[in-house]
C-alpha cells in the first residue's frame, strides 16, 4: 500500500486566541509551511493562520 500524499494540518491563529482550522494539504507539492489569511471569530477580524502539527 502506498503512502498517503494528503495530510491533515492545523492552522493556528497568530492573534493568540487559540482558534484554529483543520485542513488538508498535499505533502509532496507543498513542502513549506502553509499560511493563510482567514477569519478569527474571537477577535472578529481576518488574521493570518500558520500551520502547526495536530497532536
Swiss-Prot record:
The keyword Transport does not apply. PROSITE patterns: RIBOSOMAL_L33. InterPro entries: Ribosomal_bL33, Ribosomal_bL33_CS, Ribosomal_bL33_sf, Ribosomal_zn-bd. Gene3D superfamilies: Ribosomal protein L33 (2.20.28.120). Keywords: Ribonucleoprotein, Ribosomal protein. One of its GO terms (molecular function) is structural constituent of ribosome. Belongs to the bacterial ribosomal protein bL33 family. This is Large ribosomal subunit protein bL33. It comes from Sinorhizobium fredii (strain NBRC 101917 / NGR234). The lineage of its organism: Bacteria, Pseudomonadati, Pseudomonadota, Alphaproteobacteria, Hyphomicrobiales.
Amino acid at each position: 500500500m502506498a503512502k498517503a500524499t494528503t495530510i491533515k494540518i492545523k492552522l493556528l491563529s497568530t492573534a493568540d486566541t487559540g482558534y484554529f482550522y483543520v485542513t488538508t494539504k498535499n505533502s509532496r507539492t507543498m513542502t513549506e509551511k502553509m499560511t493563510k489569511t482567514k477569519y478569527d471569530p474571537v477577535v472578529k477580524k481576518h488574521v493570518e493562520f500558520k500551520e502547526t502539527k495536530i497532536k
